[in-house]
Design a protein with these regions (language model features):
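C-terminal portion of ABC ATPase nucleotide-binding domains
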Residues: 100, 156, 178-231
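Helix N-cap at the start of a conserved alpha-helix in ABC-type nucleotide-binding domains
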Residues: 148-150
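Conserved catalytic loops of ABC-family nucleotide-binding domains
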Residues: 160-169, 177
């Protein structure tokens, strides 16, 4: 299943809780979650986790080289590394570094290392998730440190690499929902609406209300440049 699913809703609606349940970080107090018809708690835990790549809001980078931060001990496929680095929008930054992929991500232990910005670290975490050969990709606000235009461009590129993978995205910026096959709208810890972008806009419900409110915000704050893309 290579369905691309976006999860949206107001703060506290249950979006991240839903993802934590999928990853077995929480156990359901009611009902069950099935994967291929099998309760997810019946899978061996480590085997289950190998099916997932994830990027959370509290992503981490380490005082290792750029290459090691992306591959994290996995076999190095140079072409694939270059591909995910470019898709994440980190290629120009790495090419500008004296040691390229060998540059240490921090000056904590190496004065020749490089300090990355929050947005650059987030891109590295995204590249790491894309590098892992997993069947399911989960991204919880993966682009929060990026501006709306950079996020829009990144999603457009990223989805190309996710062919053949089931993908879940949580985002407060609703324009990226246009790239997804399905949007789940959470409210009060339940799924209130379910459908593609066009269907939900025609429904004129909660999703349409949030989308239009956000588009109006961008029109005011970005002089129409972002809103033009979104509409």
């Amino acid at each position: 299943n290579d369905e691309k699913i976006m999860i949206v809703g107001e703060n506290g609606a249950g979006k991240t809780t839903f993802i934590h349940l999928l990853l077995r970080l929480y156990r359901p107090t009611k009902g069950e979650i099935l994967l291929n018809g099998v309760n997810i708690n019946e899978y061996e835990y480590n085997d289950y986790l190998t099916m997932f790549s994830s990027v959370f809001q509290d992503y981490k980078t380490f005082a290792f080289s750029c290459l090691e931060n992306i591959t994290l001990g996995k076999k190095v496929n140079t072409d694939h590394v270059k591909e995910v680095v470019k898709l994440a929008g980190l290629d120009e930054k790495i090419e500008s570094l004296p040691e390229k992929m060998g540059t240490i991500v921090s000056r904590l232990y190496d004065e020749n290392g490089t300090e990355f910005s929050g947005g650059e670290k987030q891109k590295m975490a995204i590249a790491r998730a894309l590098y892992k050969d997993s069947k399911i990709v989960i991204m919880d606000e993966p682009t929060a440190a990026l501006d709306p235009l950079a996020e829009y461009d990144l999603y457009k590129k990223m989805l190309l690499l996710m062919q053949g993978r089931l993908s879940f995205f949580i985002s407060h910026r609703l324009a990226s929902g246009k790239f997804c096959d399905r949007i789940l709208v959470f409210s009060k810890h339940t799924i209130q609406e379910d459908g593609c972008h066009d269907y939900l806009m025609n429904l004129q419900g909660l999703y349409a209300e949030m989308y239009n409110r956000q588009a109006e915000f961008y029109k005011r704050d970005y002089n129409g440049s972002v809103a033009k893309i979104k509409n």
